[in-house]
């Protein structure tokens, strides 16, 4: 498959959709906008899957699945869309590299909830990623100060870009992230840290986040 060019035989992207070209000719299978999961890698995952099942699974079934599948739990999992704001649970992101990967999935600046147990790892590489991909950073836990310092010391940082808020508790962090959201915003829990300062594991942390988000009205 190819995202860059049309193929005589295979799966490719054309005019914002995934197409298949085979012995029956070329046809549009899935608009990229119809994929619920964010990120180029998910487009490529669907391309590979479509190539494997083309001719075996009807195209309308593929479209229905793509529009409904929210992803694997705690891995950039779409929790809810409320008043045009999308909330994602990426609690498995317990290191800067995982959070970086999550941020790069979105084509817009996001509202990020980060921080947690201090594993004594550097956040230098995360700072520039937050400057590039985050509009508001909400910090909690023992690593809040370290992450803040990494962001404020990153190239391109200017006061208020992103806005940085430190909170006293996980619940306060989620509330602050949700405050003043507008339709089209993305709020993501992607801590870049382990959960042991407050939770038994990343799953418990992710479930706590989801409970709070589902309780919003």
Residue ranges, per PLM feature:
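Nucleotide phosphate-binding/pyrophosphate-handling subdomain across enzymes
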Residues: 30-134
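Extended acidic/charged loop-beta regions that coordinate divalent cations
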Residues: 1-32, 68, 72-75, 79, ...
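C-terminal helical cap/extension that packs against the catalytic core
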Residues: 125-184
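Short, solvent-exposed loop/turn segments at secondary-structure boundaries
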Residues: 199-202
